[in-house]
């Protein structure tokens, strides 16, 4: 597709003091959407997993100090005399200790889990960012589509109102029937009920968009879709097999689950470490005075360094049980990844077909709407000539407005399929939002009418 210059795009989106373009809504959603803000905090927390895991491999340095005031009575007994001494004295102990793991398989496994969890947090946040783009477009398009449907109902209601006025005039002139009046009144009343329902749908859609953007919105300030020229489907650029390869490699949900699988794999290794020895370098510097009755009024200054070896012998079978449990959880994670992969590829195929067939669908509904409009005009002439009846006009108008409604839905669905195809493939980014925003412009702008959208 022709790339739309960003400078031009920003110029288009900035026109109108109170108007709101899709790019403006995106910037607001980045700051105010509660789900995305929560994802940001979740991502920040996940970034610490690697550091926490690495800490188990690094030196552990501790300092301790203990001071006491002691009062004691010492009685010495021998065969001749007994002496009793009373002592009031201060004592302290100061210890600086260092431990450096040299061989600790469990600590290494925990570190690898931390790395995997950090990568998993990155992929999950990437998915949340892409999901925000999808949710924003859905909320945006739902609001505009609801408004468009409401406008179609208003136009249909006006048409029925004019037809009702004509039926009444013909009835008074003796050329019409009461049946014609009642039929048109019934259609008019039905449209009124549908209009009330559609107004509720519009209010709900606007509320969803307001919740995402964090600001009060008026539907009339949103840039409408300017997809008046038939888009060209560029299905030859990338085949379904190429899209499948992209999804397997880049889909954020699959990437998240792959990192989760790595966490499960290292959990097996961490459990296995229960069978293995650990070796640590230990060093300490200790100062004490009058630490106990046995070294009263004596001061010690001791430095030591050495190796500490721990060899597990038997733990009641818990290590083997933990390994079996971790292995089962790993298989569970693998099965869940396989299931998610199949679901992702199925969704990818659906959106691929929706996008590539969307152009033909839009063209078909354009032709249907045009034919339906001609049918309305022809039916009116036939009724005037006595060849058709009033009900035929009502049915023809109903078909026309239904076709226009289906055409509007097809346009929004086509853009949504374009967006979801990229989301499922894992390639969706802010450049796509810029490109998508170019299709929503002030009504006076016609640039988008001459553009096509890349596959």
Show where each model-derived region lies.
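Bacterial Sec-pathway N-terminal export signals of envelope proteins
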Residues: 18-66, 72, 100, 217, ...
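Small/polar (Gly/Ser/Thr/Ala-rich) solvent-exposed segments
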Residues: 37, 60-80, 88, 101-127, ...
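Short sequence motifs at beta-strands and strand-loop junctions characteristic
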Residues: 86-90, 237, 299-301, 402
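Amphipathic alpha-helical coiled-coil segments
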Residues: 38-53, 128, 132-152, 162, ...
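Periplasmic alpha-helical coiled-coil/stalk elements that build and connect Gram-negative outer-membrane
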Residues: 131-246, 351-354, 358, 399-401, ...
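Hydrophobic, lipid-facing positions within transmembrane beta-strands of outer-membrane proteins
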Residues: 92-96, 243, 303-309
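Acidic, low-complexity, intrinsically disordered peripheral segments
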Residues: 406-455
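Bacterial N-terminal signal peptides
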Residues: 5-14
């Amino acid at each position: 597709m022709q790339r739309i210059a960003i400078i031009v795009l920003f110029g288009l989106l900035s026109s109108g003091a109170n108007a709101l373009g899709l790019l403006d809504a995106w910037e607001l959603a980045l700051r105010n959407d509660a789900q995305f803000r929560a994802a940001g905090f979740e991502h920040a927390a996940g970034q610490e997993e690697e550091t926490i895991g690495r800490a188990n491999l690094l030196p552990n340095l501790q300092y301790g100090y203990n001071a006491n005031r002691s009062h004691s009575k010492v009685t010495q007994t021998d065969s001749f005399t007994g002496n009793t001494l009373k002592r009031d004295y201060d004592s302290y102990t100061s210890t600086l200790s260092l431990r450096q793991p040299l061989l600790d398989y469990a600590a290494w496994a925990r570190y690898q889990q931390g790395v995997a969890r950090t990568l998993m947090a990155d992929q999950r946040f990437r998915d949340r960012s892409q999901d925000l783009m999808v949710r924003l477009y859905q909320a945006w398009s739902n609001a505009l589509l609801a408004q468009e449907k409401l406008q179609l109902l208003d136009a249909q209601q006006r048409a029925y109102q004019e037809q009702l006025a004509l039926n009444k005039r013909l009835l008074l002139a003796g050329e019409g029937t009461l049946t014609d009046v009642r039929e048109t009144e019934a259609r008019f009343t039905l449209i009124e009920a549908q209009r009330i329902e559609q107004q509720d749908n519009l209010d709900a859609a606007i509320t969803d968009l307001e919740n995402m953007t964090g600001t009060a919105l008026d539907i009339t300030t949103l840039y409408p879709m300017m997809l008046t020229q038939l888009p060209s489907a560029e299905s030859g650029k990338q085949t379904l097999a190429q899209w499948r390869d992209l999804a397997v490699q880049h889909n954020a949900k699959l990437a998240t689950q792959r990192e989760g699988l790595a966490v499960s794999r290292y959990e097996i290794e961490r459990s296995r470490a229960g069978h293995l020895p650990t070796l640590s370098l230990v060093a300490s510097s200790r100062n004490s005075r009058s630490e106990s009755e046995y070294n009263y009024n004596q001061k010690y200054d001791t430095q030591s360094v050495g190796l500490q070896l721990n060899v597990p012998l038997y733990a009641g079978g818990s290590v083997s049980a933990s390994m079996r449990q971790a292995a089962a959880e790993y298989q569970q994670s693998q099965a869940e990844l396989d299931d998610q992969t199949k679901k992702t590829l199925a969704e990818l195929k659906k959106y691929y077909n929706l996008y590539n067939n969307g152009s033909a669908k839009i063209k078909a509904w354009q032709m249907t709407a045009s034919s339906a409009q001609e049918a309305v005009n022809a039916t009116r002439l036939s009724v005037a000539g006595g060849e058709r009846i009033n009900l035929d006009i009502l049915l023809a108008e109903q078909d026309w407005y239904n076709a226009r409604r289906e055409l509007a839905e097809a346009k929004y669905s086509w853009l949504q399929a374009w967006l979801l195809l990229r989301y499922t493939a894992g390639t969706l980014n802010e450049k796509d939002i810029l490109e998508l925003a170019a299709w929503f412009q002030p009504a006076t702008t016609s640039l988008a009418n001459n553009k096509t959208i890349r596959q």
